[in-house]
Swiss-Prot record:
Domain Collagen-like: 1468-1520, 1524-1579, 1580-1618, 1664-1715
Full protein name: Collagen alpha-1(XIV) chain
Family stated for the protein in its record: Belongs to the fibril-associated collagens with interrupted helices (FACIT) family.
Nonhelical region (NC4) as annotated region, ranges: 1227-1468
């Protein structure tokens, strides 16, 4: 027996130790004692007994505390004790008892209870009469003894309990508060129609835990009490009292009129705000208040709060353990007050508490309605109208005076049902509500929509407005299916009801929708449809002045918007096609035509939007004219002169012949084409001769023969003769005289118009005219007529100078010797002084910009450019350039300045109107200029660096005496300090950013140095109270990270400043919410010479203990070794032993005041690359550049700098925000393309990386795009998967972008499969991307936030192209509202979705799974996957580039290709790749891969072997003509091409000259087949051609030495056997590659090597899917389609030449646009020409399987070697291209050579084709500039079209091998989630 006096010294001094007792981490691991009993042994002693717990423990701790607040007494007992006697007790005193079992550092939960000696004796006496044992108590359920009171009154009440949840209570005591609340609620009859209980918790901000109407049963309320969470924060009781008045005692919260209102406050301290007014407001509202104070509560404050009398309404206890002692008294008081209040309410108010009646609604509109009612009986003070939407929403209310019986409800939502309740408010109560519903009307919509003034690119919309509308929203989009981007939206104000819609597509039907807007709400739509006009073609084509080599075309103009015309004219026989573009004229003369030839002409109108349909017609040129006026004169006895008049300027030569009439030999002479006479000598005297003459023209056509008779004479008189033009040689009788006729001129033409001149041309009909008089007069007659005389042999005249843009009448009159002939007149008009067009600004820089324009249609003499600064005063400057220049680089401009630019066209008669525009240079200036460390004689300035600045000039100037200091700094220096300043002086600090020789404008700031110090007054010292636990910030509520602080503890800090760092850490960590494994874990390292771990990540699991540990950190001292500390954090703290967790953010915060004495860059950079986030805080003398190197990017979020340790408060909030945002991210940080992004590298997570893929069944590594990126082939049923909890343990974010780079294979099934999806544990899909190879659609699916399954499917031409066998880059952009698809960096569609819900992490994620699969026995589709990432942002798709795709790679903006090879090296190639693993040997234990052996020498060329089985196809060749496969679907409209004529007479159109970038054009003129054209140089990558002839294989090199037997290594990456290919074909392909490398087109042609889908080993392949029709390629010689051969390897392509004459048409291709016009007028159909170049080769025979090679010897065991280098240039790369290497090619000596069959599978990318136009001139802008630069220092533009020499020579055979796998085992396994979590280390090796 123990005496109380003996054990009294063992007890502790204060019961507060019990209240503050913190259960250890191990609590609960030791079982507690049970069956606690009491027995009185004498009047002051009690025996305590209990049942020992199970398990091992060391002893007991017994605690006894008097309820009156005395000492807590403690007793330690052995583990064998089960009884103890406590003496010296007071009989009528209550005692609290706790018994705890403990073992080492672990303690059990306490068995606890309360007792009083008198109560024990009373129960003992009672039990004797009832034969019961009242001493038994349940220690596990500490219900207060004797609290058996239950309120049984029928009266009901609304009780709201307000609980203090501030930090001062603590989590342990809050459990006691819950127990008190549970006992309190249990005393009342709780129910929805009985007493209702609500509860609010408060600290710094109150919150409703549940309303009065939240729970309908007592059990539900008690369950809510037991789960009440602890809030934490400050103590603002007044705010909380106001809060419950406004929120808890409301009808919508469950408060009932006519029911007692009770408020019970529980608090443990004095309020930090005023409580008197809020408490009075509650009491005035009829709410009876009870106040319960615990521990440190202010009794006076409690009395101010509670209702009277204080004796029954105020309770105060010394500790939380004694709260249950007041439950009975409190519940009895509340119960009696409820009964009394009910009597008062019923007795005094019941008669007057009638509710209003007869609820009526009226004046209903879309935004409100009126509510009316009949008055309530009695004296009503107010009426309260409560209303809210039936579908849910925040209730609102309107209060009106008691005399009113109506209220208007405003600002409601349209077409919404509202619940209405009207309450009568009396002086101390409210009536029941009068309830009803009403629905608002729909918003009024616009009406009478009219669409008019329709053109090809615009229309106007007009509608009737709506009263009350705040504006209108107009949506318009093409009616045809298109992209979401095609829809346009315009918002206008309420005053406008008419709008012009421009920028429309021609000949397109548009849907126009008008919404009336009422704020953010929109009315129902008003919709109309209208079709834009087609682009107007010209009309009324006429042909005139048709000669043998020219014809004049005339047509009526198309419209005022036409930019010009394109004229195509072709010979009907299809042998020649020509094309010319002219300006906006209506006439043009075709020249250099062929005589007697029919021509077909098509004229297209050219617009900015494209070209119109053609206007067509035809004409036939005339026969060539014979010479005219053949005469013989100047006859003598042996000669005479023959003269004639030429009839054309294109005569090549003449044949002149003569023969005597009486017989003799004929003689002939050939004369030049410019001859017009000849003297024939050596004739017989007095003899008549027949003289004949014919003209031979340039095109080798001959004219008719013209003949004349001439004779020699005896005398001296010349005999003139007349001329007879016949086809035979005839003569007329000579006449002695010449007849002269007064005829006018013929064919008067006025052409070559300029702004100041006209050319007049005519044919002379009579050579007897001596002169011609040319007169011209303006058509208006406002100028005097002028005349010019010209000789009779002249037939052309240039009239100048004339007025511009003026019509003239020109008249020609022949003048004869005896008078005038007949006059002929014609009109002509000079051109206007047209201004330049389309002013463009580009190449903006800090001191220059480029101006470009389009030339006007009128020929100019040059251009005058005038430019002037808009804001900076100064004169206007000007410059002149020639007429062949249309771009100019303006230099020496001011930075960041707007300039007005004017361009004038210069003509001989003056200048045109100005083409004006505004341009602005880039701003070269710093930002965020600020000052710091301002002292009496010094100050510092800092700024944000300019990204292009190379230096800074910083000037400080005194505003008092003007003294200056100036310094020049480097481009990376963001701050500078000035010294030797004057105290108390204002200074101006200016910073000029400099870029080379350019200096930007000054950025300035004013600052005043500190004045001389004065003696500050002394003040008494104060002692700061200990810091309280800070509340968690809202931004940190979701934070979950491993956070490590690295604190500088070097000597430079000092004790005082180190304490400030500790305070800063205390505040920063205090802002976090949950601490421990389920929240944020915190560790701290203090560093100087050596780092010291203050505590690890897993050291503390509560904020209280963590903050206490921070305060205990002691100052270290030493030097500054920051790099060593960072490395220590990585090696010691970021480990599993220290508590690091996977898949959550890892954050380091470095705090330092100086420069590190070791290297910090390397280790911080390495950790950042691994996903760690760094924050760097520099103080005072810290090195800013070092902080930037430590901190993550962007530095604005991760680097902080303060002047001193007192300035931490300036950055605290911002740092906490950024750290918590980083810690709250669902996604880890990864590095991608040099950017630090939040996301997931899914290829790594699935093991699809070079070091891991070999462990995955059914996966092989192959070369991807450019033959340098690795990609992975997922073979059939590979079913690559991983558990979701390893990949996305926190699920997916709400916004993210999925990125794939993949290729569909020929053996990919035609049924749907999931490219990637997440399944739950029942294998049900949750989210994923589905491709339907048969339907050519893409579908995204997930579950939305409501749990509904949702899918969006995309289709169309952009979607279909991903199924045609090329690599494509796919972005699936998912946001809370939309799903967007981007293919090859081009948007393909966007659709609306709901926000996603949560996903289960208990399932798996799978690649390629077939949709029809069910359960664990799944099937998967084969495909090639090169890239798979998920980036946690929707903006990534806009930032990402298609650098991995050959056709879209931009070398200037893309990183260099990995291991890109060059053809400029010597013929000898680099060291070969590592050798492959050997054949199967003796199976042994699992070993490592051996070291690669050296490359053996090349063996001699071998003989052609027996054809073997077909290998996988090799890399893709450039797009050529493929073997025709199955018919494809109708093609989409192509890019701009040449529109063809239908009919038999059509001919191929020629390529156009370089044109401007325009809209998509029409197809050119098809024509007849011509002769085979020469092969052109290589063109762009196109459709694969046919394979070449297989070459012969080389013999195997000598076998290496056999290594010692060893265990086989892990499964290697051996690929399938390669393919042998024709060396001639290979070399041709390689030469294309090399030449294009030289030409800068490496990106486009590297795809030759990679885009061939590999197939499993087979001797036969099936035809691939039909190819997608692409855009027309660059015009080149098009060859005829070859006959289909066997399917096989796509061979080397045809080599299209540079744009030139159009080649012959090929076989029928993809369906194009319909031709235009009607049947051609004339001409028989042409015959088909022979096939052109680039045709498919003949098929090779299928090979038979070769013999199996012998098994290799087992190699010696070795460590795993590094992966082999990527592909390299073959030694003959510049004459052929070796495609092997890099991935372990099989080198077995007995591998047979196989002959590849043809493959009809098309693999081409439509994006790789040219747009159907010649490439524009290349300049430094983004638009074509067909003119040279005006500055000599810049290169002239050149035509960027590839020119290659065809490869024709024979070359040696080269063996090609495609890396891949030659076998794999199809895996059929029941995959469970559990087995997927472990490595398949013992996977069976696949059979050979």
């Amino acid at each position: 027996m123990l005496c109380w006096n003996e054990v009294q010294s063992c007890f502790l001094l204060a019961f507060l130790a019990v209240a503050a007792y913190s259960v250890s981490d191990a609590q609960g691991q030791v079982s507690p004692p049970t069956r606690l009993r009491y027995n009185v042994v004498n009047p002051d002693s009690v025996q305590i007994s209990w049942k020992a717990p199970k398990g091992q423990f060391s002893g007991y701790k017994l605690l006894v505390t008097p309820s009156s607040g005395g000492k807590t007494n403690q007793l330690i007992l052995q583990n064998t004790a089960t009884k103890a006697i406590i003496q010296g007790l007071i009989p009528d005193q209550n005692y609290a008892l706790q018994i705890i079992a403990f073992s080492d550092d672990k303690e059990s939960k306490p068995a606890q209870g309360q007792f009083r000696i008198k109560d024990i004796e009373r129960r003992k006496e009672t039990s004797k009469s009832k034969v019961k044992d009242p001493e038994k108590t349940n220690a596990s359920k500490p219900t207060p003894e004797g609290n058996l009171f239950t309120c049984k009154t029928p009266a009901i009440a609304d009780i709201v309990i307000l609980v203090d949840g501030s930090w001062s209570i603590g989590r342990f005591n809050f459990r006691l508060v819950r127990l008190f609340l549970e006992n309190l609620v249990s005393a009342f009859n709780v129910g929805s129609e009985k007493t209702r209980v609500g509860l609010a918790q408060y600290s710094g901000d109150p919150r409703i835990e549940w309303h009065l109407n939240a729970y309908g049963t007592k059990d539900a309320v008690l369950d809510a009490v037991r789960n009440l969470p602890y809030k934490g924060g400050n103590t603002l009781t007044g705010l909380a009292l106001t809060y419950i008045l406004e929120n808890s005692f409301k009808p919508e919260a469950g408060a009932r009129p006519g029911v007692s209102k009770i408020g019970i406050l529980i608090t443990d301290g004095k309020s930090q705000d005023d409580v008197i007014p809020p408490a009075k407001n509650l009491r005035d509202a009829g709410i009876e208040l009870f106040a319960i104070g615990v521990k440190n509560a202010d009794i006076n404050e409690l009395k101010e709060i509670a209702s009277e009398p204080d004796s029954t309404h105020v309770y105060n206890v010394a500790d939380f353990n004694f709260m249950n002692s007041i439950v009975e008294g409190l519940t009895r008081t509340v119960c009696s007050r409820v009964e009394e209040q009910e009597k008062e309410i019923k007795g005094t108010i019941a008669a007057s508490l009638g509710a209003p009646t007869d609820l009526v609604t009226s004046d209903i509109t879309a935004r409100g309605f009126r509510v009316s009612w009949t008055h309530s009986p009695g004296k009503v003070e107010k009426y309260r109208v409560v209303y809210y939407p039936t579908r849910g929403g925040q209730p609102e209310e309107v209060v009106v005076d008691g005399s009113s019986s109506t209220a208007v409800l405003k600002n409601l939502m349209s077409l919404t049902e509202y619940q209405i309740a009207v309450f009568a408010i009396y002086s101390n109560a409210a009536s029941e509500g009068l309830r009803g519903t009403e629905t608002t009307l729909a918003l009024p919509m616009a009406s009478d929509l009219k669409l008019y003034d329709v053109s090809h690119s615009s229309m106007r919309a007009k509608w009737n407005g709506v009263a009350g509308a705040t504006g209108y929203m107009i949506l318009y989009a093409p009616l045809t299916e298109g992209l979401a981007a095609d829809e346009k939206e315009i918002k206008i104000g309420e005053a406008s009801t008419e709008l012009e819609l421009d920028g429309l597509l021609p000949n397109t039907e548009y849907t126009v929708t008008v919404y009336a807007m009422f704020g953010e709400e929109a009315s129902d739509p008003l919709t109309g449809q209208e079709t834009t006009l087609p682009l107007s073609p010209p009309s009324n084509l006429k042909f005139s002045d048709v000669g043998h080599n020219s014809a004049k075309l005339t047509w009526d103009p198309a419209s005022k918007n036409v930019k010009g015309y394109r004229i195509m004219y072709v010979k009907t026989d299809g042998t020649e096609t020509n094309e010319v573009e002219v300006g906006p004229v209506s006439t043009h003369t075709l020249k250099s035509l062929t005589a007697l030839t029919e021509y077909t002409v098509a004229i297209f109108s050219l617009y900015d939007e494209g070209q119109s349909e053609p206007l067509t017609g035809s004409f036939t040129t005339r026969k060539v004219p014979p010479p005219q006026h053949l005469e013989v004169d100047e006859a003598s006895t042996d000669s005479f002169r023959v003269s004639w008049k030429p009839t054309s300027s294109d005569i090549a030569f003449y044949r002149l012949a003569w023969i005597p009439l009486d017989g003799g030999e004929s003689e002939e002479v050939v004369l030049s084409g410019d001859a017009d006479s000849y003297v024939i000598e050596g004739l017989l005297p007095n003899t008549e001769y027949e003289v004949s003459l014919l003209a031979v023209f340039d095109d080798e056509t001959e004219s008719e023969v013209v003949a004349v008779l001439g004779a020699t004479i005896v005398g001296t008189t010349a005999i003139p003769t007349t001329v007879t033009t016949t086809t035979t040689t005839t003569a007329t009788t000579p006449k002695p005289t010449i007849a002269v006729f007064r005829t006018g001129v013929r064919n008067l033409v006025i052409d070559d118009e300029t702004t100041s001149s006209l050319r007049v041309v005519w044919d002379i009909s009579d050579h007897n005219a001596q002169q011609f008089r040319v007169t011209y007069l303006t058509a208006k007659g406002d100028r005097a007529e002028e005349a010019i005389m010209v000789p009779g042999r002249q037939n052309t005249l240039l009239l100048q100078p004339l007025l511009p843009d003026t019509e003239y009448k020109v008249t020609i009159t022949p003048i004869y010797a005896d008078g005038e002939g007949v006059s002929v007149s014609a009109p002509g008009k000079t051109l206007p002084l047209s201004a330049p067009r389309n002013l463009r600004v580009s190449d903006e820089w800090y001191n220059r910009l480029r101006i470009s324009w389009d030339a006007p249609p009128s020929p100019t003499m040059g251009y005058r450019i005038v430019y002037k600064s808009i804001n900076v005063p100064g004169p206007a400057l000007e410059t002149f350039v020639g007429d062949d220049i249309n771009t100019i680089l303006i230099l020496n401009l001011f930075s960041g300045t707007e300039y007005s630019v004017k361009v004038f066209a210069s003509y001989s008669t003056g200048f045109s109107d100005a083409l004006t525009g505004v341009a602005k240079t880039l701003y070269l200036g710093v930002t965020n200029l600020d000052t710091y460390q301002v002292r009496m004689t010094s100050l510092c300035a800092q700024w944000q660096l300019h990204r292009h600045a190379t230096a800074y000039r910083v000037v400080i100037e005194s505003l008092v005496d003007g003294k200056k200091q100036e310094v020049n700094l480097g481009g990376g220096v963001p701050r500078h300090c000035f010294f030797e300043l004057m105290p108390g002086t204002e200074y101006k600090i200016s910073v000029h950013a400099q870029l080379q020789e350019i200096e930007g404008p000054a950025v300035s700031i004013m600052e005043t140095t500190l004045p001389f110090p004065t003696q500050p007054p002394t003040s008494p010292s104060t002692t700061l109270p200990p810091p309280t636990i800070p509340p968690a910030k809202e931004v940190c509520k979701a934070a979950k990270a491993d956070l490590v602080f690295l604190v500088d503890g070097s000597w430079s800090i000092g004790d005082d400043n180190f304490n400030k760092i500790i305070s800063f850490l205390y505040s920063t960590v205090g802002a976090l919410d949950k601490i421990g494994p389920d929240g944020t874990q915190v560790a701290i390292i203090q560093f100087s010479d050596d780092p010291r771990t203050e505590f690890k990540l897993n050291a503390y699991k509560t904020k209280e203990t963590l903050l206490e540990a921070i305060q205990q950190i002691a100052y270290k001292g030493g030097n500054t070794k920051t790099g060593k500390a960072i490395k220590h954090a990585r090696e010691v703290l970021f480990t599993g032993e220290a508590g690091m967790r996977k898949g959550i953010p890892k954050v380091l915060v470095v705090i330092t005041d100086g420069r590190s004495q070791d290297d910090v860059n390397k280790v911080s950079r390495e950790m950042q690359l691994d996903g760690f986030s760094f924050f760097a805080i520099g103080v005072a003398d810290a090195d800013y550049s070092e902080l930037v190197n430590i901190g993550s990017k962007p530095s604005e979020r991760h680097v902080f700098f303060v002047d001193d340790f007192d300035a931490f408060t300036k950055i605290e909030d911002e740092l906490i925000t950024f750290v918590c945002e980083t810690a709250s991210a669902t996604c880890p940080l990864v590095f991608k393309d040099g950017d630090k992004l939040a996301g997931f590298k899914m290829m790594e997570m699935f093991g699809l990386v070079e070091k891991e893929f070999s462990a995955i069944d059914g996966v092989s590594m192959e070369p991807g795009t450019f033959n340098v990126y690795p990609c992975y082939r997922l073979h059939k049923d590979a079913l690559v998967s991983q558990p979701t909890k390893y990949l996305h343990p926190e699920g997916l974010p709400s916004d993210y972008t999925i990125t794939f780079l993949f290729r569909i294979l020929p053996d990919t099934p035609q049924e749907p499969f999931a490219l990637w999806e997440i399944l739950n544990e029942q294998y049900e899909p949750l989210v994923g991307v589905i491709l339907d190879n048969g339907g050519k659609t893409l579908t995204f699916f997930n579950y939305d936030y409501k749990g509904d399954f949702q899918t969006v499917t995309f289709e169309g031409p952009e979607i279909r192209k991903i199924f045609y066998g090329s690599f494509h880059k796919l972005h699936v952009v998912i946001s809370k509202t939309t799903a967007k698809i981007i293919i090859d960096c081009k948007e393909a569609g966007e659709k609306t979705i709901n926000a996603a819900g949560n996903i289960s992490s208990d399932g798996i994620e799978v690649l390629g799974r077939m949709v029809r699969s069910r359960g664990p026995r799944d099937n998967s589709a084969p495909l090639q996957l090169q890239m798979f990432d998920i980036v946690c942002a929707t903006s990534w798709a806009n930032r990402d580039k298609c650098c991995e795709l050959p056709g879209l790679r931009d070398e200037e903006n893309c990183p260099a290709l990995p291991h890109a090879c060059s053809c400029s090296e010597a013929n000898k190639g680099p060291l070969g790749p590592p050798g492959p693993p050997g054949g199967p040997g003796v199976r042994g234990a699992k070993g490592h891969r051996g070291d690669p052996g050296p490359k053996g020498p090349d063996g001699p060329r071998g003989e052609i072997g027996v054809p073997g089985p077909q290998g996988p196809p090799g890399p893709q060749g450039p797009s050529g003509l493929s073997i025709q496969g199955l018919p494809g679907p109708p093609g989409e409209k192509g890019e701009k091409g040449d529109l063809g004529f239908p009919g038999l007479q059509g001919v191929p159109g020629a390529s156009g000259s370089p044109g401007r970038d325009g809209a998509q054009g029409q197809r050119g003129l098809p024509g007849k087949d011509g002769p085979t054209g020469p092969q052109g140089p290589p063109g762009p990558v196109g459709i694969p051609g046919a394979p070449g002839v297989p070459g012969i294989t080389g013999s195997q090199g000598p076998q290496g030495d056999v290594g010692a037997p060893g265990a086989p290594g892990p499964k290697g990456e051996r690929g399938e056997r390669g393919d042998l290919q024709s060396q001639a074909m290979v070399r041709a392909v390689a030469r294309q590659v090399c030449e294009q490398l030289i030409q800068g087109h490496m990106a486009r042609y590297n795809s030759i090597l990679n885009q061939i889908p590999s197939q499993s080993v087979s001797t036969r392949t099936i035809a691939g899917p039909p190819g997608e029709p692409g855009r027309p390629g660059a015009p080149g010689p098009q060859g005829e389609q070859g006959s289909p051969g066997m399917q096989g390897f796509p061979g080397n392509p045809g080599q299209p030449g540079r744009p030139g004459e159009r080649g012959l048409p090929g076989e029928k291709g993809d369906r194009g646009n319909p031709g235009v016009g009607t049947q051609g007028p004339r001409g028989p159909p042409g015959s088909t020409g022979p096939p052109g170049e680039s045709r498919t080769g003949s098929p090779g025979p299928p090979g038979s399987p070769g013999p199996r090679g012998p098994a290799g010897h087992t190699g010696p065991p070795g460590s795993q070697g590094p992966a082999g280098p990527p592909g390299y240039c073959d030694p003959s790369s510049c004459a052929g291209y070796g495609m092997g290497g890099g991935y372990g090619e099989p080198t077995d000596q007995d591998i047979p050579v196989v002959q590849l069959p043809h493959n009809s599978y098309q693999i081409y990318d439509p994006e790789d084709l040219y747009d159907g136009e010649q490439q524009p001139y290349v300049v430094h802008g983004s638009y074509p500039l067909p003119s040279p630069y005006s500055q000599s220092s810049y290169p002239s533009p050149h035509l960027a079209q590839p020119e290659f020499t065809p490869v024709r020579e024979e070359m040696e055979a080269v063996e090609l091998r495609s890396p891949g796998i030659s076998r794999f085992r199809r895996k059929i396994a029941k995959r469970s989630i559990k087995t997927l979590e472990h490595k398949r280390e013992n996977a069976k090796e696949p059979s050979q």
